[in-house]
């Protein structure tokens, strides 16, 4: 049996607010990271404020499965990923991922983390659909999500403004049966 929380490049671990909050504060000082990740205007928060927010979030969000992303090679904390179950009866969830350490951008770590969380979503939580949204200008993320099996399901035109221009938000999703078919093909390659 495979370790549910380990991929080819990363492993998911529990959230440690004390550790992750200082990394979050540093990552969120990177305006490019912030603008690729979030609808909100870029702003700065202290590690203390982030830690307090994380602790409240972890306590109150019983339908959220939130993990740190660590490299297998040296156990380096490089990002986080969360899966928010939006409807248990229909098996729906929303996923978000952020690789905060720039040295790991564009090298497959985010895609690997997404593959791990999808395995968890479909094999452990028995979900039917996982969805996400992404800004159209985040082409690297769109390619990563497509590699993980997500398909474009819709767009909200001119939803976000960045640098004086309006951009679309793309909505992508993957169904359990689509993932299972691809997972079976990957499993037989081993």
What is the predicted function of each stretch?
Residues 131-134, 151-168:
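Conserved catalytic-core motifs of GNAT/GCN5-like acyltransferases
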Residues 43-103, 175-178, 187-189:
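Acetyl-CoA-dependent GNAT
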Residues 106-120, 142-147:
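Conserved acetyl-CoA-binding loop-helix of GNAT-fold acetyltransferases
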Residues 145, 150, 172:
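Conserved active-site tyrosine of GNAT-family acetyltransferases
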Residues 1-51, 178-190:
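A short, well-structured alpha-helix characteristic of acyl/acetyltransferase catalytic modules
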Residues 101-103, 107, 123, 136-137:
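Active-site acidic-Proline motif in GNAT/NAT acetyltransferases
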Residues 110, 114, 137-141, 158-163:
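Short glycine/proline-centered loop/turn elements that form peptide/ligand docking sites
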Residues 123-133:
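Conserved GNAT acetyl-CoA-binding A-motif
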